[in-house]
Curated annotation (Swiss-Prot):
UniProt superkingdom: Bacteria
Keywords: Ribonucleoprotein, Ribosomal protein
Recorded family membership: Belongs to the universal ribosomal protein uS9 family.
HAMAP family named among the record's database cross-references: Ribosomal_uS9_B (MF_00532_B)
Pfam families according to UniProt: Ribosomal_S9
Single annotated GO MF: RNA binding
Coiled coil: none
Ribonucleoprotein found in the keyword field: yes
Name of protein: Small ribosomal subunit protein uS9
A single BP term in Gene Ontology: translation
GO cellular component, one term: cytosolic small ribosomal subunit
């Protein structure tokens, strides 16, 4: 019985994922998916997407530790980590996950604030007179 480790990232959120063959148990920060997310069905589907695409929702156990960012970024980091772990588990899943963009790290992050500006791009109000 092999244990596979992978990390997923999105914005400032980081997910550490351990995948083992099992019966479909999903533990995130020592909680079930429903306890961790509450009633956010769309975000739950994001997390489950790689498992549903590869039809592994009943055959692998996933233990994850997620920190940083908000719920949506954490869910996408978790999805990225699960996808990478499934790819390491069986290389045949790459053909399913890669076209959906689940193995690609979303590199969009917050733009830095520049001096002389109020935010990244917002300038102070201009007065002609």
């Amino acid at each position: 019985m092999r244990k596979i480790y992978a990390t997923g990232k999105r914005k400032t959120a980081i997910a550490k994922v351990w995948l083992t063959p099992g019966k479909g148990e999903l533990s995130i920060n020592e909680q079930s998916l429903n306890q961790w997310l509450g009633g956010h069905e769309a975000i739950k589907m994001k997390v489950m997407q790689p498992l549903l695409l590869t039809k592994q929702e009943q055959s692998v156990d996933i233990k994850a530790v997620v920190f940083g960012g908000g719920y949506s970024a954490q869910a996408e980091a978790l999805r990225h980590g699960i996808s990478k772990a499934l790819n390491a588990y069986d290389i045949a899943f790459r053909a399913i996950l890669k076209p959906k963009g689940l193995l690609t790290r979303d590199s969009r992050v917050v733009e830095r604030k520049k001096y002389g500006k109020r935010k990244a791009r917002r300038s102070p109000q201009f007065s002609k007179r």
